[in-house]
Amino acid sequence: AWDAILHGATGIMWWGSAYADRPHPFFDGWMTVLREFEGLHPFLFAGQMPHVWAETYYRQHDPILGVGVLARRAGNRTLVVLINQDQYAHETVLKGLDEAVVMRLRRVGGGGEGLVKTREGFITALEGYEVRIYITD
């Protein structure tokens, strides 16, 4: 889903489940996804922040698609999503975001490694196909 949003999707089209058995594990997962996207609604239509990008450095393999970055601002909140589109781990440098904004970003869904300031930007390591979500409070 994040890859679709990265490439321009702004919603999910669903045309029904009248013939599906209930209860079904698929619907539990589907409703979880819909609830998560409901909270993202303001960011889906906000448009990409200009001049924000990610540079990908390989660990063991050259990047194929590399890491995409979704950076959007809605009101006084900022959402940054790093999406590793490759099966391989990559070092990623986030560039173009003001340091004051980056210092306010909080990782969604777990601790672990954050964004570390370097001369070039803010670096972090992403595993293959990993999605890392940050949002300001």
What are the functions of these language-model segments?
Residues 111-117:
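Surface-exposed loop/edge segments in extracytoplasmic proteins
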Residues 1-38:
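Aromatic/acidic polysaccharide-binding cleft in carbohydrate-active enzymes
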Residues 20, 88, 113:
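Surface-exposed, flexible loop/turn segments at secondary-structure boundaries
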Residues 96-111:
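Solvent-exposed beta-hairpin/edge-strand motifs
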Residues 12-16, 80-83, 104-107, 135:
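Conserved active-site loop/cleft motifs that coordinate metal ions or position small ligands
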Residues 117-137:
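C-terminal beta-strand-rich structural cap/linker in extracellular carbohydrate-active enzymes
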Residues 60-99, 129:
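Carbohydrate-binding surface patches
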Residues 25-74:
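Pol beta-like nucleotidyltransferase catalytic core
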